[in-house]
Amino acid sequence: MTIETMLSEEKSQSSDNRNNGSIKVGISSGEVDLESREVFRTGDDVLDFRTVSWQRATIMFCKINFAMSILAIPQAISTVGAVGGSLILVGFTSLNVYTALILGDFRNRHPECHMLADMMGLIWGMVGRELVGVQIIVLQILITAGGVATTAVGLNALSNHSQCTVIFGLASAILVTACSSVRTFSKLGWITWFGMITFTVGVLVFTIAVTQQDRPAAASPTGDFDLGWTAIANPGFVVGMVSSANLFICTSGSSMFLPVISEMRRPQDYRKACLWAGLIVGMLYLVLSLVIYRYCGTWLSVPAFGSAGPLFKKISYGISLPGLIIGVGIYQHVAAKYAFVRLLRDSDHLQKNTFTHWGTWLGINFAFGTAAFIVAEAVPILNYLLGLAGALCAAPFSLIFPCLLWMYDFKGYRSGTLIQRAQYTIHVLIALIGLYMVAGTAYAVVVAIKMAFQSGTIARVFDCADNSGSV
C-alpha cells in the first residue's frame, strides 16, 4: 500500500470517527494494528531500524537542540537585555516543548507518518505534503550551512587562518556529510553521546574562561570601559526580531524528533524523552547564556567563542568542534533520511543492503552537503542563517503546523464545552504567533543581510578572508 493510499484512508477514517473532540484513529481500536502501519517493519529478513531506546532518544533530542545556537544566544540576549532575553527564551522554550508533544502524540496516533510532511498531507493532501517536504529540506540545509560556517570559523581560529576560509568551509562540509551518512539513528546515537559531551565541555570551558578575565577580550586592554550590561534593552525592530528569532530557533527542532520516533523501540516513550530533553536544554541555554552575558556584556563575538581571547578561543573550539560537527550532521541526516524514505518507501530497497539502497543514501547526503556548503559561503554569518531558518521554516514547523494538526484531530473542540473551546482558541493564538514570527523575522533578516553587505560585514561570497578574528 502506498503512502498516498494510507494517508487518504486515514483522513477519511479519522474524519468519520471524530466525535466532539474524541479521537479514534482509523477504525476501532479492536480492529486496527498501529504497529503494522509503522514506517520501519521488524523481522528477520530486513535491516532493523527500530533499535533506539528512550534514553538514547533523549540524548539525541538534546543534541539536536543544544548545538551552535549557544554561540549566538548570548549576542541575542545582549540585544534585548538580560530580563527581556530570559523571558523570551523561557517562553519560547516552553512553547516549543508543548508543540513538540503535540507532534509526537499526533505521529503516534498516525504511525504511518514518518515526517511532518506526511502529517500535513493528512490535512492538505499531496500538494501540501510535497510543499512541506521542500520546507523540511530547506530548513535542514540552512541550519547545516550555519554549522558549516561556524566550523570553518573554528578551523580558522585553530590554525591562525593557515588556509583560505573557503577551503575550511569545504572541509567542514565534508566532515558533516561523513557524519550524516551514518545510516541509522541507533548507530548515530553512539557518536551523539560523544558529541554532546565534547560540545558541552567546550562551552563550559569557554564560560569559565570569560568569568576569569579582568575584562572582555574585545574591550580596550587599558583604561575604563562600559560593559554594556542591561536588564531590558530597547532595540529597533529589525535587530530585535533577528535576536528573537535566534532565541526561538534554539529549541525549535521538534520536527526533527519525528523520524527518531519511527526508529524507537517503543514510540510510546517519546513524551518521556521529549520532556527530559526540553528541561535539560532549556536550563543549559538559560544559565550559560546569562553567565556569558554577565561577564562579556556587549563585547560579544558571533560565534561567542571569540569573546574568550585567543588562547581560550582555540581551546574551546578544539574541544567542541567534534560535537559541533556531529550535531550539524544530525540535521543533515534528518533531511537525507526524509528524502531517502520518500524515494524508496514501499520498495525492497528501503531496508535491504542493495546497490540502489546505498547509492540513493550516499547520493542524497552528498547533494545536501554540497548545497549547505554553497549557502554557507553565500551568507557566512551564523545569526543571519539561524534567523532565516527560523523565519522560513522553524516558525511554521514549531508553532503553526502543530496547532493545525491538533485542531485537525480535535475538530470537535471548536463547538464543544467551554473548556474545549478555550483549548481550541489557545491553539489558534499559538498559530497566529507563528504567523507573526514568519512575517516579522523574514523581513528583519532580509534587511539585516542587505545592511551587512552594504556595510562590508559580509564582503563578498566565497571570501577567503579570515572570519575568526585570529589575524
From Swiss-Prot:
Sites where a glycan is attached: N20, N160
Record's function text: Transmembrane transporter; part of the Fusarium detoxification of benzoxazolinone cluster 1 (FDB1) involved in the degradation of benzoxazolinones produced by the host plant. Maize, wheat, and rye produce the 2 benzoxazinone phytoanticipins 2,4-dihy-droxy-7-methoxy-1,4-benzoxazin-3-one (DIMBOA) and 2,4-dihydroxy-1,4-benzoxazin-3-one (DIBOA) that, due to their inherent instability once released, spontaneously degrade to the more stable corresponding benzoxazolinones, 6-methoxy-2-benzoxazolinone (MBOA) and 2-benzoxazolinone (BOA), respectively.
Keyword hit for Zinc-finger: no
Family: Belongs to the amino acid/polyamine transporter 2 family.
Keywords assigned: Glycoprotein, Membrane, Transmembrane, Transmembrane helix, Transport
Regions crossing the membrane: 70-90, 131-151, 162-182, 190-210, 229-249, 273-293, 315-335, 362-382, 385-405, 429-449
Disruption-associated phenotype: Does not affect 2-benzoxazolinone (BOA) degradation.
Subcellular location: Membrane
Region span, Disordered: 1-24
Disulfide partners: none
GO molecular function: L-amino acid transmembrane transporter activity
GO annotation, cellular component aspect: membrane
InterPro entries given in the database record: AA_transpt_TM (IPR013057)
Membrane topology reported for the UniProt record: Multi-pass membrane protein
Organism: Gibberella moniliformis (strain M3125 / FGSC 7600)
Note from the entry: Fusarium verticillioides possesses 2 unlinked loci, FDB1 and FDB2, necessary for detoxification of antimicrobial compounds produced by maize, including 2-benzoxazolinone (BOA). The FDB2 cluster arose as a duplication of the FDB1 cluster with rearrangement and expansion by incorporating additional genes.
Induction remark: Expression is induced in response to 2-benzoxazolinone (BOA) exposure.
Name of the featured protein: Transmembrane transporter FVEG_08292
